[in-house]
Amino acid sequence: MTEVYIDSTVKALQQLHQTTLRTDKRTVRIVEFLGLQAESIVEAHKAGNSAVCFHLCCWCKQLIGKSREEVMNGELNLAMAQQTIASEHGYKDWNAVEAQGNVQLDLPFENCIDAMLAGDLNELSETLATTPALIRQQSQYGHRATLLHYLGANGVESYRQVTPLNAVQIAECLIEAGADVNSLANIYGGSKPLGLLTTSAHPANAGVTEAVAAVLENAGAT
C-alpha cells in the first residue's frame, strides 16, 4: 500500500466529516452532500472542535484572517457555514449550489480521484484505460478541477488535500493518459496544475514538489 502524506489539520477534517464522507455517493445530490458538511461545521464549532478553523479561516468571508481563538469564540450560523463550503468548492455563494438542483456527484470521476489520492496506481491506470474521458473531465463542483488539479492538493476540498508519496508516478500516469497540463480550474480566480502544486504546503511537506513539477514542466506545463 502506498504511503500518503496527510497533514494533521486535514486528518482532523476527515474525522470531522467522516459520517458525511460515508454517504452513498450513488444517490446523493451535490446540494445535499455539501449541506451535510455545512451542518457538521456548525455542530463542531458549537462543540469546541477547532478543526473547523481550517475551513473558516480560509473560506468564511467574515472570518478569513482571524485567529483560531477569535474564530472559536465568535458566532457561526448555518448560513455562514454554507457560504464557507460553497466558496471552498468554487461556488460564488450557496445560491449557486442550490441552483444545481438535482445534480448528483459523478461516481466514476469521484472514485478516480479517491484512487489517485490513495496512490493506487494500478486502479487509476485501469480506470483511465477503461474510461479515457475521465482524464479531461472536470469536477461537477464549482471549482471545475481535473484529476491533475487535485494532485496539487490546493484549493480543492479540504479533506482531499493530501499527497501520495508516489505522486511522480501518478503525474506520469495522468499525462500519459492525455491530461491537459495547462487546464484552467476555477480556483483562486483561475489556476493551472503547476501553480497549484508549487504553492501548496502538502506536496512540499511530502517532499515531492520539485520532482512532480519537473514532470509537469517536461510535458509543457506553465
Give each language-model segment a name.
Residues 80-84, 146, 169, 192:
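Amphipathic alpha-helical interaction segments
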Residues 105-116, 136-161, 183-203:
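Ankyrin-repeat boundary/"N-cap" motif
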Residues 126-134, 168-180, 213-222:
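Ankyrin repeat domain, specifically the short helix-to-loop turn at the C-terminus of the second helix
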Residues 97-106, 162-175, 211-217:
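Short alpha-helical "patches" and their helix-cap loops
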Residues 103-114, 204-222:
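Ankyrin-repeat-protein effector appendages
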Residues 2-130, 143, 161-163, 182, ...:
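Intrinsically disordered, low-complexity eukaryotic regions enriched in glycine, serine
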